[in-house]
Structure formats: structure tokens, C-alpha cells
């Protein structure tokens, strides 16, 4: 595979980070910076999210520069094929080729995307494998991520989970407890790192919106978009929400979601404004000023907890029927709404009224720790040699 990356060979541990989607860039932002500070680091991007608004803009938002001094990863790997099988095959084949060539001393992945399946290549090549966001479970087999989670959890040498719930799920699968660590979520560190930029964003002025006079919408998950039944149920509910509140609903719309809407011919209420995907700082500024946030994003519970911790609660409504973040539900940081009209209207009414009355949950401790990147690099540094010696018997 053609690329220009070379290790610095400065004596530091050689760590490769594999990612392929917008959420991974966001969650790994502080960790990537910390790894570049303490390791000889190579960031590989498998380009699942190929649209500029879902990839390039985020490297810029977080000022993540590669070894060549440019915003972006060190190595960009095209993997998207004509179907899921080809894409996953490309991820496995091309990650195997890169790992074979560069031979990092450790490989780090986060989460549950198809790009995380590159972990299989690292395992087969005896590269110590570290997994952030390990142990997340929503117990819903309709989510493709649930399969990826189990695969990567079980084969990883060291699992780093967000919460005690996740640690328990890992233990239930038989993953060694002695190589499982609870680090907390990296999102608070990322949000704090960008809070000043978020607050300075002029996105409301650019979009002609006013504080508390719009609802922010994000709907992109496969189970909501690709299922005909769920798609119709959800967007019928969104139209009902627009009619009830009679204000703009700003839809940060992914390309595949937009394509699905166009292909279906579904007529959105005129008050639902379909917008291109927004950058991190703009989107969070919109979250901080919206009357309510209606989203199927996995980061919503963590963002809600963070904003609650800094005295700026948001009305967070999750348009899903399951969650892999029960600790945030337990803390009262968001409402799990479902995707029917009745469920969505009731949940949104409740979230808005509770916020206005100051009836709030409490910040989830796992979601407000701003030292996660430090923990991650220390764990990696400590276990690279242990895994090479005890698991792979390299010396």
C-alpha cells in the first residue's frame, strides 16, 4: 500500500491508532494528542466516513496534525466497497498489509465500528491490542455494532471501559479481569479542550437561529434509517414534533440519511430544515442553545452529563429503543424516547419541562473525568512489553 509514513525511530514505543469514522476522531482527539506527545505514533484512518463534513473538518476542528504537519491522519486507507462484505474485507486486508509492513509495538482502537475489525489483523500478527470503549452493550442484536463489540472485546489484550456496567459485561464474557481497566469516557476531556471554541462559534447567527427557539435533530443510525418501518415511524414522529412546537427543527443530516429521505420521497414538515453535517464546535454550540436535542447519537448521554457538570443542562432526548450507556440513564442525564410519535412527544415534553423547572439528573462520574488520555497512554506503555512477553513470548 502506498504511503509516505515512516517511524521516527527515536527510541519511544511505536503505537498505531486505527479509526475510520467521525465519532472515533472525536473520541480519540485528546488521546491522539497525548500519544503523539509520548509515543512514536501513527494514525491510520480507514475512511468509512468519506464525506468531508464527516471526516476532514474534524481533524481541523481538533487541530490534529499528522507527522507531515498537515491536518489529518498519517495514512489514509480507502476501504468503502459496493457492499458491507467488500468494505469489511478491505478493512481486514489493508490493515493486515499495513501492520505487516510497519510492525507497531501496539495497536489501539476505540469502539465498535467496522474499522475496529482491523483489530483482527493486529491479533493475527501478534501486535499487542488495546481497546477503548470496551464492554459497551445494548443487548439489541439489530445493531451491527453489537457484533463488532463482542469480537473486539474478546480478542483484545487490554480492554479499557468507561463504566462499571461495561466492566461487568466484559467479565460476563470471560475476558480476563486482570487486563480490564475502567478509565471513564474521553468525551469530557475533548469537550473541555474545545469549550472556548464552542462558545465562540457564530453558528446561530449563520443559520438564523435564536436560543431556545429551535430543536436540534440528529438521526443517522442504521436501525433508524435502513429499516422501512423504523424510518417511517421516526420521521412521522419528527413531523409531529415540528407541528406541536411550531419552530425550526435543524436536522444535521448525514449523506446516507439524506439519500434515504430523497429515495423514499418522504415529505418532511417545512419546519424541519435539512442541513449538511455540522462540525464539532458548531454542533455543540447548537446543543447548548437548543430548546431540546433529539438524537440517536451515542455521544448524547456523555455530552449531556458534561454540560450538566458545568452548570449548563440540556434537554437530551435519545431516539432509540436501547442504550449502551445505562450509567447515564441511571444518573438521569437523558431520556430514552423510542421512535413512535407518542413516545417522542411525551419524552420531549418531559425533557423540556424538567430543564425549565430545574428538575435535573446528576453528572455521571464516568463521563466527567478529564484525565482519560493520560490513563490510556500509561496503560499502553505499561502493557506493551507485558503482552509481548507473556502472551506472544517474543522475549
Kindly give the residue locations of the regions a language model identified:
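A nucleotide-sugar donor-handling region in carbohydrate enzymes
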Residues: 2, 48-53, 78-79, 152-229, ...
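C-terminal amphipathic helix plus adjacent low-complexity
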Residues: 353-395
Amino acid at each position: 500500500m502506498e504511503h509516505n509514513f515512516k517511524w521516527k525511530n527515536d527510541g519511544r514505543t511505536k503505537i498505531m491508532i486505527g479509526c475510520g469514522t467521525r465519532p472515533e476522531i472525536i473520541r480519540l482527539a485528546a488521546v491522539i494528542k497525548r500519544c503523539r506527545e509520548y509515543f512514536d505514533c501513527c494514525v491510520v484512518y480507514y475512511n468509512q466516513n468519506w464525506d468531508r463534513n464527516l471526516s476532514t473538518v474534524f481533524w481541523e476542528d481538533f487541530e490534529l496534525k499528522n507527522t507531515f504537519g498537515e491536518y489529518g491522519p498519517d495514512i489514509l486507507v480507502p476501504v468503502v466497497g459496493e457492499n458491507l462484505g467488500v468494505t469489511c474485507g478491505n478493512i481486514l486486508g489493508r490493515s493486515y498489509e499495513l501492520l505487516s509492513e510497519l510492525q507497531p509495538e501496539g495497536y489501539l482502537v476505540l469502539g465498535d465500528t467496522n474499522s475496529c475489525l482491523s483489530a483482527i489483523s493486529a491479533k493475527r500478527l501478534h501486535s499487542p491490542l488495546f481497546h477503548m470503549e470496551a464492554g459497551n452493550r445494548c443487548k439489541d442484536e439489530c445493531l451491527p455494532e453489537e457484533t463488532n463489540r463482542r469480537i473486539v472485546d474478546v480478542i483484545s489484550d487490554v480492554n479499557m471501559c468507561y463504566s462499571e456496567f461495561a466492566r461487568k459485561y466484559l467479565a460476563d464474557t470471560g475476558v480476563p479481569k486482570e487486563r480490564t481497566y475502567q478509565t471513564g469516557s474521553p468525551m469530557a476531556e475533548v469537550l473541555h479542550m474545545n469549550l472556548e471554541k464552542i462558545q465562540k462559534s457564530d453558528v446561530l447567527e449563520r443559520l438564523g437561529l435564536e436560543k431556545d427557539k429551535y430543536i436540534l435533530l440528529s438521526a443517522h443510525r442504521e436501525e433508524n434509517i435502513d429499516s422501512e418501518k423504523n424510518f417511517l415511524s421516526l420521521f412521522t414522529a419528527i413531523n409531529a414534533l415540528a407541528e406541536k412546537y411550531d419552530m425550526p427543527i435543524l436536522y444535521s443530516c448525514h449523506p446516507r440519511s439524506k439519500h434515504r429521505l430523497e429515495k423514499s420521497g418522504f415529505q418532511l414538515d417545512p419546519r424541519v430544515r435539512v442541513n449538511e453535517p455540522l462540525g464539532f464546535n458548531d454542533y455543540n454550540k447548537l446543543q447548548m442553545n437548543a430548546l431540546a436535542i433529539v438524537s440517536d447519537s451515542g455521544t448524547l448521554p456523555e455530552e449531556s452529563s458534561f454540560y450538566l457538570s458545568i452548570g449548563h443542562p440540556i434537554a437530551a432526548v435519545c431516539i432509540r429503543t436501547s442504550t449502551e450507556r445505562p450509567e447515564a440513564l441511571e444518573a438521569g442525564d437523558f431520556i430514552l424516547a423510542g421512535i413512535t410519535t407518542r413516545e417522542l412527544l411525551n419524552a420531549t415534553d418531559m425533557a423540556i419541562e424538567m430543564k425549565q423547572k430545574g428538575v435535573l439528573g446528576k453528572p455521571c462520574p464516568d463521563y466527567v473525568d478529564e484525565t482519560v488520555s493520560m490513563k490510556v497512554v500509561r496503560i499502553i506503555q505499561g502493557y506493551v512489553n507485558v503482552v509481548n512477553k507473556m502472551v506472544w513470548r517474543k522475549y
